């Protein structure tokens, strides 16, 4: 075993957003943080070794992603997602969220519409609004805890009508989906993609959680389905979630369409770089030598997921959970507690002493829900679940 995922590592005092910004975010310091989507264990030893070696060189001048890194990414994507890409399609950046903002800025004008599918990762909304575009919600359908695209409503949104001042130019896809944990099937993606193609809507596909899939589920990049979707999609990826290196600010965008790629790069190059020295070193080490560590992490996370779902459904009345197909996030249905959203947030903070992401942060369909991060040692997870059980049951 490369590392002991069950070992607690103290993160307080490390300038961790998750652990050191509790007062600023929740108004209370003494909470168990299970919110921000990073992991509470060290990254792969191969990454740490590579960073130390680069640090020992002592000179940290301007840098660039070399051809070897591009080839390593091409091989990773082929092996893990069965997608043949060319290294020329890869555009490096310093994060998925900045890259999404640049894409919205590049491919919309003020007043254009961008479709998102809530409840969904909240920076999608700000990426649209910050760049002068208008958010259009195509809310996911929830059937007994399993979420699906509402394609009928999507068609209605895109239907031309005299009342519409503008039409949608982009759809931001979350795949796998944060926070509901869906790993979209090929057929679902193909139907969604077909509608976008028919209506000249480009797809921005955030696939940062692509490596977190469990059991029989398989991640399929929507751009890999056919040539038309490849030409119509920008795919956003990074090793940051997979290898717990979000603070190193390195990501990439796969853009097959040369015209779109050039337009994106014109805006990007004036705003952000290609990632810092240590981020690029970490990315190379991760995709070249991190396979064993990742496999062990996925096994541990899968057990965490099963443990949490069973514990909640058997021990915590008023809260239900469905095992996520992907991501290390669990979407808790708290509607059975019969609390308003403000009451629920107060209850989680002040009674359960937990820091979770309130469902309302994720937009429409988030009312009555909480998102819990399970990427932590089992002891931390058990403590969080026990806190929740005691609070709900009124145990002392």
For the regions a protein language model found, what residue spans apply to each?
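Short clusters of hydrophobic/aromatic residues that line enzyme substrate/ligand-binding pockets
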Residues: 8, 17, 60-62, 222, ...
């Amino acid at each position: 075993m490369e590392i002991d995922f069950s070992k607690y590592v103290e993160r307080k005092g490390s300038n961790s957003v998750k652990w050191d910004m509790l007062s600023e975010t929740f108004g209370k310091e003494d909470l168990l943080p299970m919110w921000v989507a990073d992991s509470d264990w060290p990254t792969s030893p191969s990454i740490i070794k590579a960073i130390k070696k680069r640090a020992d060189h002592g000179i940290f001048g301007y840098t660039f992603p070399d051809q070897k890194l591009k080839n390593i990414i091409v091989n990773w994507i082929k092996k893990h997602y069965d997608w043949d890409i060319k290294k020329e399609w890869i555009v490096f950046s310093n994060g998925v969220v900045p890259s999404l903002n640049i894409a919205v800025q590049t491919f919309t004008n003020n007043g254009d519409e961008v479709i998102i599918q809530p409840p969904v990762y909240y920076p999608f909304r700000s990426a649209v609004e910050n760049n002068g575009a208008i958010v259009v919600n195509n809310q996911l359908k929830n059937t007994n805890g399993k979420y699906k695209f509402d394609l009928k409503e999507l068609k209605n949104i895109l239907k031309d009508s005299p009342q519409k001042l503008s039409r949608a130019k982009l759809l931001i896809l979350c795949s796998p989906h944060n926070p509901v944990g869906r790993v979209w099937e090929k057929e679902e993606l193909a139907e969604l993609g077909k509608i976008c193609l028919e209506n000249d809507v480009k797809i921005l596909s955030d696939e940062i959680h692509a490596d977190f899939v469990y059991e029989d589920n398989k991640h399929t990049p929507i751009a890999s389905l056919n040539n038309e979707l490849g030409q119509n999609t920008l795919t956003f990826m990074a090793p940051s979630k997979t290898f717990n290196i979000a603070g190193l600010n390195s990501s990439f965008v796969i853009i097959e369409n040369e015209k779109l790629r050039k337009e994106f790069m014109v805006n990007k190059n004036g705003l952000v770089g290609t990632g810092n020295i240590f981020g690029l070193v970490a990315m190379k080490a991760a995709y070249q030598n991190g396979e064993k560590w990742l496999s062990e992490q996925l096994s541990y996370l899968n057990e965490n997921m099963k443990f949490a779902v069973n514990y909640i459904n058997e021990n915590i009345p008023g809260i239900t959970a469905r095992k996520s197909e992907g991501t290390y996030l669990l979407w808790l249905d708290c509607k059975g507690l019969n609390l308003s959203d403000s009451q629920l947030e107060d209850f989680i903070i002040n009674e359960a002493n937990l820091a979770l992401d309130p469902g309302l942060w994720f937009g429409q369909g988030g009312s009555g829900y909480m998102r819990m991060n399970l990427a932590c040692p089992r002891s931390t997870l058990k403590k969080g679940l026990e806190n929740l059980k005691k609070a709900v049951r009124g145990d002392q």
